[in-house]
């Protein structure tokens, strides 16, 4: 059984997890081509290898939407209301159009179903009425689907993770300032080991948690 260990002491975000998984692939350049071939509309995916302390190097993802690069650490505003809102059905429609194995599609859908359920509990409304903010944007869909595709390609059968560092302080969202972890993220982390810190910023995002 192939087991993956994730050190999440500094949190978990979709783009960072995708870069970490890509670093494990024997041919990252070929894998980036497969990620691009998923066919997320208007999206260009590239990656570069960067120095990473004394341990060596790591892959950093670059996602461009219609020629504009999204902020790689957009978890700072994943709850922002300054973005086009995407419904659960809207995200599912995008996933249904992607050129990916059904098994990968099902895993990506499961991630978004978990997010929708957590948002439903946090806001006290039916899942059908949930509107995703940043997590419904195309770069987040790339993060989620890309991670699911990489896990399948790498033939990972079991994932073990350290306690997840969630950060601290507050995060700004459409409903004002919320403590970290935000309510929806806290629901997503139920059953998992997590810890406050390090620092006073949001380290575990609504996409990183369910992934």
Where are these regions (language model features)?
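Extreme N-terminal starter segment of soluble prokaryotic enzymes
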Residues: 1-4
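General beta-strand structural signal in soluble alpha/beta enzymes
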Residues: 6, 127-134, 160-163, 196-198
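Conserved phosphate/anionic-ligand binding catalytic regions in large, soluble enzymes, centered on
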Residues: 6-20, 132-155
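Acidic, glycine-rich active-site loops and adjacent beta-strand->loop/helix elements
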Residues: 9-10, 37-39, 51, 136-138, ...
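Glycine-rich nucleotide/cofactor/substrate-binding loop typically near the N-terminus or early
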Residues: 23-123, 182, 191-209
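Phosphate-handling active-site elements
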Residues: 24-33, 152-162
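Alpha-helical transmembrane cores and adjacent cytosolic helix/loop segments
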Residues: 116-134, 138
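Mobile "lid/hinge" segments at catalytic clefts and subdomain interfaces of large enzymes
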Residues: 156-211
């Amino acid at each position: 059984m192939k087991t993956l260990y994730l050190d999440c002491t500094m949190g978990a975000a979709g783009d960072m997890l995708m870069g970490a998984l890509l670093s494990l692939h024997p041919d990252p350049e070929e894998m980036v081509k497969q990620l691009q071939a998923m066919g997320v509309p208007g999206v260009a995916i590239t990656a570069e290898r960067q120095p990473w302390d004394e341990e060596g190097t790591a892959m950093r993802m670059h996602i461009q939407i219609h020629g504009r690069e999204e902020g790689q650490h957009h978890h700072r505003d994943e709850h922002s209301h300054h973005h086009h809102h995407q419904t659960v059905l809207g995200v599912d429609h995008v996933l249904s159009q992607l050129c990916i194995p059904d098994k990968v599609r099902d895993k990506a859908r499961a991630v978004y179903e978990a997010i929708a359920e957590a948002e439903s509990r946090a806001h006290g409304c039916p899942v059908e009425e949930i509107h995703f903010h940043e997590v419904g944007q195309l770069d987040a869909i790339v993060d989620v689907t890309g991670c699911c595709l990489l896990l399948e390609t790498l033939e990972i059968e079991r994932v073990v993770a350290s306690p997840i560092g969630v950060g601290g302080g507050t995060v700004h969202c459409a409903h004002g300032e919320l403590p970290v972890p935000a309510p929806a993220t806290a629901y997503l982390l139920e059953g998992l080991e997590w810890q406050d810190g390090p620092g006073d910023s949001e380290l575990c995002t609504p996409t990183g948690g369910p992934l």
